């Protein structure tokens, strides 16, 4: 959020997109979706040692209150529809963080029942590798997500009109 021009002693102007992005990056509310051992490290990240509140990150248990989902652990094909339903229940804008080798690429489980990376089903914004990644790695990934949010040029959603959507569908 760059300051455009100071106006006297009382006013500072800035772009509205920058202000909205600053507010969004300063209030990320991730929904925890722990599926395996990475969930333990995610819980450790939320402990007082790391103090996520100072970054505006507050864990939520409901998808309707969250704007970010952290997929932590092995995603099985049986669990995938549940994850997709939870993702669809989240309000826009929403972000996805893949935590751990299993969520990023399937990990060591190259089998018919494991999804080989959550990016096959959801648009992932940040990948955090490791087996399991340390709490500091998750914190670093969330800070990188904040950086990505600040660089977003289209803060107010898609600008595609209804007519353009209908034309592309035909």
Swiss-Prot record:
Enzyme Commission code: 7.1.1.-
Q: Which Gene Ontology molecular function entries are recorded, alphabetically?
A: 4 iron, 4 sulfur cluster binding; iron ion binding; NADH dehydrogenase (ubiquinone) activity; NADH:ubiquinone reductase (non-electrogenic) activity; quinone binding
Provide the coiled-coil residue spans: none
> Where in the cell does this protein reside?
Cell inner membrane
Family recorded in the similarity comment: Belongs to the complex I 20 kDa subunit family.
Assembly notes: NDH-1 is composed of 14 different subunits. Subunits NuoB, C, D, E, F, and G constitute the peripheral sector of the complex.
Q: Report what the protein is called.
A: NADH-quinone oxidoreductase subunit B
Q: Gene encoding it?
A: nuoB
